[in-house]
């Protein structure tokens, strides 16, 4: 199944964080913070959205709508909730 966001929205896949601390302690799922970085999978049809497919973005902590497509978890973010693009 394909999904195309509408307007100024982006479909993103969360970038998972390391499950161990720097000192080697393994974190249980309940102790992990919700990730705030994601890879952009698809963007809406608005010319005002400033991200493109493949960008890694940082987004506001309590934003977005979680959805499941083909057994994978994604989020739909409004462009206003995207705080910036990670550049390497």
From Swiss-Prot:
InterPro entries with a match to the protein in the record: Chaperonin_GroES (IPR020818), Chaperonin_GroES_sf (IPR037124), Chaprnonin_Cpn10_CS (IPR018369), GroES-like_sf (IPR011032)
CDD domains, per database record: cpn10
Primary subcellular site in the record, as a coarse category: cytoplasm
Compartment(s) of residence: Cytoplasm
Gene Ontology molecular function terms on file: ATP binding; metal ion binding; protein folding chaperone; protein-folding chaperone binding; unfolded protein binding
GO biological process, alphabetically ordered: chaperone cofactor-dependent protein refolding
Quaternary context: Heptamer of 7 subunits arranged in a ring. Interacts with the chaperonin GroEL.
Family: Belongs to the GroES chaperonin family.
NCBIfam families: PRK00364.2-2, PRK00364.3-3
UniProt protein name: Co-chaperonin GroES
Organism name: Rubrobacter xylanophilus (strain DSM 9941 / JCM 11954 / NBRC 16129 / PRD-1)
């Amino acid at each position: 199944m394909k999904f195309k966001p509408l307007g100024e929205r982006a479909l993103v896949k969360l970038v998972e964080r390391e499950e161990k601390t720097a000192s080697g302690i393994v974190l249980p799922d309940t102790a992990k913070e919700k990730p705030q970085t994601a890879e952009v999978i698809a963007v809406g049809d608005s010319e005002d959205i400033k991200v493109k497919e493949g960008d890694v973005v940082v987004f506001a902590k309590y934003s977005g709508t979680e959805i499941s497509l083909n057994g994978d978890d994604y989020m739909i973010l409004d462009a206003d909730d995207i705080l910036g693009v990670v550049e390497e």
